[in-house]
């Protein structure tokens, strides 16, 4: 599938996910006679197709509706009732059940559902959809009073409002709200973008999986692939969907996205970007969509492509926060210095409102009993960052691997533990609770003790029984809850701009502004000459010609 005009690949993926989530379950006309079902889907198909070019995702979406209504493609195509006449028939569908009988109105439902599908497939705004509705009403010769009622109903689909639908939609309103209202409200939510950056072997994949509560990033991802993985939170539709971009082609959505699918995408070097959408555990907001972007782990000496892909993404994608992971075992490296300086120069200095927070991972490698000084190590890290130009850097130490094991136990996934992981779980649990290793006490320029998740009950791991409440407290001690709280607070207080800009867009705006000022100066000189020489002899026209030539040359050089 090629990129739609005006949409980024990320927007196109989100649009495809919305169409994929159109399951048409609980459709009101599903219980009617087959001839009414055929008429309904035929009219809907013709209305939708009248507005859109052929699209494989839309075709797949309409195919699901045929399956739900138990109508074949041949039966749909054979229905040739004219649209005005067909809509009139749908306004008075006879039904009977037992000793009851009467008429049902599906005319309004067909019109609204057609416009909703067009709006999702074309990524239309509410205003554009209302214009499409007006066009459909004109085609179907619908009365103006009904058209106004349907237009008013669209406001309800986009915003959470209390309203009483007109009698034409009374029986269908709950389906429309369940099917489309949730989709459009999710689509309209602002997005808070977080990029995760690190050099090789910082434990970035483990950190992302422990933060989000599932194995979204295959183990060893940073060492073998130069791709971006973007994961969007969707609390309304928790089922995980995914698709990938191979070169300049966006592939259709896949569901369910299994670990095997992720591994296949990860090992394919032609895939440049993976898009995922599902319910992220422990982070997020109902008012804003959190999107986490995993960038390739960089190592400029081994694979410069990883570094290039990371910087290209950071420069050309609007970001609200960057989380930078440092390996506690190797904090001061040339690769770290190179990447951090580029991030500062190309992102933070260009878009100062972008927030950056530093995590020192793999702190569990420290042997405090043998004299390893965690406090001094973190102080040194802060000083090194300040020398690179990061004023009062916020530094949070974390044990991402321990956090991943604790989260798995809390989520009932302890049966997936290997023998080695069971032993490591016991060791981490002992260090956090019995030896009082609380990493939240070692934070620099930030104070986030972290909120332990609520948990009850117990779990058996190996030969030991663990209280889940204590596991939750051990999870808090790893520092991962502090990171989650940091993101939650940022997301909840996020006030989006009209259109957040990437560093590249900001630079282009600055360049355009500078050029326009220079052009204004040239035009001002020209205006002044005209005022001073309006009554001068014709010989002065040569100076005028020279000024015009200068202006033409400038426009040619800067076009």
Protein language model annotation of sequence segments:
Residues 2-201, 214-281, 346, 371, ...:
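N-terminal low-complexity/disordered regulatory or targeting extensions
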Residues 7-15, 177-437, 457, 468, ...:
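Globular "head" domains of long coiled-coil molecular machines
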Residues 410-559:
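P-loop NTP-binding site
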């Amino acid at each position: 599938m090629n990129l739609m005009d005006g949409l980024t690949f990320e927007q196109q993926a989100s649009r495809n996910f919305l169409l994929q989530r159109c399951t048409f379950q609980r459709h009101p006309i599903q219980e009617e006679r087959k001839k009414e079902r055929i008429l309904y889907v035929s009219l809907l198909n013709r209305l939708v197709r009248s507005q859109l070019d052929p699209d494989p995702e839309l075709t797949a979406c309409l195919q699901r509706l045929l399956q739900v209504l138990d109508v074949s493609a041949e039966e749909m195509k054979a229905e040739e009732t004219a649209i005005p006449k067909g809509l009139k028939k749908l306004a008075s569908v006879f039904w009977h059940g037992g000793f009851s009988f009467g008429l049902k109105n599906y005319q309004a439902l067909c019109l609204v559902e057609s416009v909703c599908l067009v709006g999702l497939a074309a990524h239309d705004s509410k205003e554009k959809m209302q214009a499409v509705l007006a066009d459909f009403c004109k085609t179907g010769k619908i009365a103006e009073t009904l058209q106004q009622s349907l237009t008013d109903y669209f406001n309800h689909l986009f915003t959470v409002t209390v309203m009483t639908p007109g009698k034409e939609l009374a029986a269908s309103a709950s389906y429309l709200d369940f099917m489309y209202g949730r989709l459009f409200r999710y689509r309209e939510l602002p997005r808070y973008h977080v990029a995760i950056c690190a050099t090789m072997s910082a434990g970035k994949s483990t950190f992302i999986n422990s933060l989000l509560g599932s194995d979204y990033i295959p183990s060893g991802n940073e060492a073998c692939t130069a791709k971006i993985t973007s994961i969007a939170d969707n609390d309304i539709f928790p089922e995980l969907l995914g698709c990938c971009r191979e070169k300049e082609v966006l592939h259709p959505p896949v569901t369910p996205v299994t670990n095997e699918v992720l591994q296949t995408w990860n090992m394919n070097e032609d895939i440049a970007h993976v898009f995922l959408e599902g319910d992220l555990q422990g982070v997020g907001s109902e008012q804003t969509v959190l999107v986490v972007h995993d960038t390739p782990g960089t190592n400029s000496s081994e694979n410069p492509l990883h570094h290039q892909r990371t910087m290209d993404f950071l420069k050309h994608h609007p970001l609200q926060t960057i989380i930078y992971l440092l390996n506690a075992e190797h904090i001061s490296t040339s690769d770290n210095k190179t990447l951090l300086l580029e991030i500062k120069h190309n992102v933070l200095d260009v878009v100062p409102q972008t927030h950056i927070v530093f995590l020192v991972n793999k702190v569990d490698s420290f042997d405090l009993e043998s004299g390893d000084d965690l406090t001094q190590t973190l102080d040194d890290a802060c000083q090194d960052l300040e020398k690179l130009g990061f004023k009062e850097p916020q530094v949070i130490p974390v044990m991402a691997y321990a956090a991943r094991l604790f989260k798995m136990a809390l989520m009932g996934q302890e049966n997936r533990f290997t023998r080695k992981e069971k032993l490591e779980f016991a060791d981490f649990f002992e260090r956090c609770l019995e030896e009082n290793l609380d990493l939240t006490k070692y934070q620099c320029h930030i104070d986030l003790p972290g909120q332990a998740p609520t948990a009850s009950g117990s779990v058996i791991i190996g030969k030991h029984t663990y209280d889940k409440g204590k596991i939750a407290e051990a999870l808090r001690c790893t520092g991962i809850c502090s990171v989650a709280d940091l993101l939650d607070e940022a997301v909840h207080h996020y006030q989006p701009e009209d259109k957040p800009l990437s560093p590249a867009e900001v630079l282009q705006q600055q360049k355009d502004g500078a050029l326009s000022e220079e052009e204004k100066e040239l035009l001002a000189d020209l205006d002044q000459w005209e005022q001073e020489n309006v009554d001068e002899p014709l010989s002065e026209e040569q100076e005028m010609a020279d000024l015009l030539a200068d202006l033409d040359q400038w426009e040619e050089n800067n076009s």
